[in-house]
From Swiss-Prot:
Belongs to the CCC1 family. Its main location: endoplasmic reticulum. This is Membrane protein of ER body 1. Residues 1-10 have a biased composition (Pro residues). Residues 283-300, 307-316, 339-361 have a biased composition (Basic and acidic residues). One of its GO terms (molecular function) is manganese ion transmembrane transporter activity. The keyword Cytoplasm does not apply. It comes from Arabidopsis thaliana (Mouse-ear cress). Keywords: Endoplasmic reticulum, Membrane, Transmembrane, Transmembrane helix. The chain crosses the membrane at residues 209-229, 250-270, 508-528, 540-560. Disruption phenotype: No visible phenotype and no effect on pathogen sensitivity.
């Protein structure tokens, strides 16, 4: 507690006495010998008796007659009015020395402070030469530091400094007790102000990946034109016979161009439709105007209550309790609504029974507990208050999104399998088909697929670790609908499941990644090993069949574990993505290999000896 004293100015005998806001005993003018000492205090004289105190009952303060205590006068150096704030520490010493002469009370609770303070004098530390030089330099320059404004005793920092915790001790002599009281009541001491940043609504904007798609298409068109352009065949001597190499029969370039262009147009249409369609369903949209109407009624009642609270606050001059929202205010709001309903019923007596019941339902208000109740009862009442405010449509959506399903472990296992295997299955299929279309051997295709899998494994482990370390985000309500309150959104629980089983999730996801990533290269390497015509085409078709089967199964599992079980939409999306990506990669690989062979940039054919 910070002790504060009532100001009682006293007259001076010589005219040069000190006038402060805390002391009631003021000493006479000092002698010239005492002026050489900096803020020194003489405590050698004895304390006087308390019999001659005169209590001022009207002002609630006590004044002490200066003439009655001539024996206990304290010698203090007289100072000008401009340097009065520098004598704060000496005043504190005088107050603590003569505690029986002052009326000390607590500014927060208003009770008297009856305990005495015992002080122990500690020897001052020895000043070094460097410190003396610094003091001399400061005095020569006429500057004073913050600690040199007053001569602080050695025991001041341990005992008295917590009582005066203001930052500017040399400038402010007394701590503002009113500010401390308000901060303690609000409970914000030592806390940084929190800033609630709400995200703006997503506005439709032109996606950036469209530019990448157009760039790839432009590059493919240039490559196709360069391949299809007529160029003179390379000169081959007639007596040389090059070894015949089996060529892979591929469809014409015009047919291959139709597949990626149609796929890109399809993806463009789907993305544009999903981009500009409303987020929420019609059921949620229908509840919004009702909630806004109820909100407007609550705002009107809240404004009337604020005017009433301001009038009462001016009378009492006390801090009013801060309610979290307008729904948690006392029952004055219910009284106003009930009077409005009675007036409407008196004006329109011919209303139907259905309308009356609807008005009663819309104006139902919960019963709020009194401030004298126990906190446990208040918590129960608040929980019962929030239950009737939920919209009727929210209950139908809770079982699919929030409530745990039966067999939650199976769902989490499926989520982990889908997370690790679905994307890698598509990536591995594209890698194998592009390598096969470029004319690589079976061994090279197998090695390339396994190498791609090893590099993707590190990226998958890194993404899993980032997902585990990601903290839950606060979901704020950006719309006007109050039925969707604020909550925490954990992305890990949505993707994989509960955080308690994170190790199991990682093991299953990594194993799924490895298994589904190895299927395309292994099928290509170990299928149709006998020499036959069109063996490479059969290998590619086998890879397509097995990979599409895996993608179909994983997409069905993804639709099963999602909140909205759209099997057809999910299946169509992933199968279309897989076929489009693999066809596009195969087309690009074939064009690049043919262009490099015809241009002569790279030739790996064995050298033949001339005859």
């Amino acid at each position: 507690m910070d002790p504060t004293m009532n100001p009682t100015p006293t007259p001076s005998s010589a005219g040069n006495s000190v006038c402060t806001d805390e002391l009631t005993n003021l000493p006479p003018e000092d002698s010239p010998l005492d002026s050489e000492k900096d803020d020194s205090v003489d405590f050698s004289q004895e304390q006087g008796s308390e019999s001659n105190e005169a209590i001022d009952t009207e002002n609630g303060s006590r004044s002490v007659d200066k003439n009655q205590y001539s024996e206990t006068e304290v010698v203090v150096r007289a100072k000008d009015l401009q340097t009065e704030p520098d004598s704060l520490d000496d005043d504190v010493e005088i107050v603590i020395k003569n505690q029986h002469k002052y009326y000390i009370y607590c500014p927060c609770c208003g009770e008297d402070i009856t305990k005495t303070v015992k002080l122990v004098k500690i020897s001052d530390p020895k000043h070094t030469k460097d410190h003396d030089k610094a003091v001399d330099s400061d005095t020569e320059n006429g500057s004073k530091s913050k600690d040199k404004n007053t001569k602080v005793p050695s025991w001041f920092s341990d005992f008295i400094q917590p009582l005066f915790s203001s930052e500017d001790r040399g400038k402010k002599g007394v701590v503002d007790s009113e500010l401390l009281g308000t901060y303690e009541d609000l409970g914000i001491i030592g806390e940084e102000p929190s800033i609630d940043v709400s995200n703006e609504k997503d506005r439709p904007s032109f996606p950036k990946w469209y530019l990448d798609v157009f760039a790839w298409l432009f590059l493919c068109i240039i490559i196709a034109l360069s391949v299809l352009s007529t160029s003179p065949p390379p000169f081959i001597q007639p007596h040389l016979q090059l070894p015949s190499m089996p060529t892979l029969r591929m469809p014409s370039a015009s047919v291959l161009l139709l597949l990626p262009t149609s796929a890109v147009l399809l993806l463009f249409i789907i993305s544009m439709r999903s981009r500009f369609t409303p987020r929420y369903h019609k059921e949620k949209g229908e509840v919004v105007p009702k909630s806004t109407d109820s909100k407007s009624h609550d705002d009107q009642a809240a404004n009337t209550d604020q005017d009433f609270d301001k009038k009462t606050d001016n009378k009492r001059n006390r801090l009013t309790p801060i309610y979290p929202s307008s729904l948690e205010k006392p029952s004055k709001q219910t009284v106003n609504k009930e009077t409005q309903n009675h007036d409407k019923e008196a004006a329109d007596p011919d209303q139907d029974v259905d309308k009356e019941t609807e008005n009663q339902k819309s104006h139902l208000t919960p019963i709020y507990p009194s401030p004298l109740e126990q906190p446990s009862k208040q918590i129960i009442n608040k929980e019962t208050q929030t239950e009737p405010m939920l919209p009727p449509n929210a209950q139908s959506e809770i079982p699919n999104s929030v409530e745990p399903r039966k067999g939650g472990n199976k769902v989490e296992i499926l989520k982990s399998i889908v997370y690790g295997g679905l994307t890698e299955s598509i990536t591995s299929l594209c890698t194998v088909t592009s390598a096969a279309a470029s004319g690589a051997s079976t061994l090279n295709v197998l090695a390339l697929g396994v190498a791609n899998l090893s590099s993707g494994l590190l990226l998958t482990v890194h993404s899993l670790q980032e997902l585990i370390n990601e903290k839950p985000r606060k979901q704020t309500n950006t719309d006007d609908s109050p039925e969707e309150g604020e909550g925490e959104e954990d992305r890990y629980e949505e993707v994989l499941g509960r955080r308690e089983y994170s190790r199991i999730h990682r093991v299953i996801a990594i194993s799924s990644f490895v298994i589904f990533g190895l299927i395309p290269p292994l099928v290509y390497g170990f299928s149709f090993r006998k020499k036959m015509e069109k063996r490479q085409e059969y290998k590619v078709l086998a890879v397509y069949a097995v990979s599409l089967l895996c993608i179909v199964l994983l997409s069905i599992a993804k639709a099963y574990v999602s909140k909205k079980r759209d099997y057809v939409k999910t299946l169509f999306r992933y199968t279309t993505t897989a076929t489009t990506a693999s066809g596009f990669s195969q087309f690009v690989g074939y064009l690049v290999s043919q262009w490099l062979e015809k241009s002569g940039f790279y030739d790996d054919s064995p050298e033949t000896q001339r005859v």
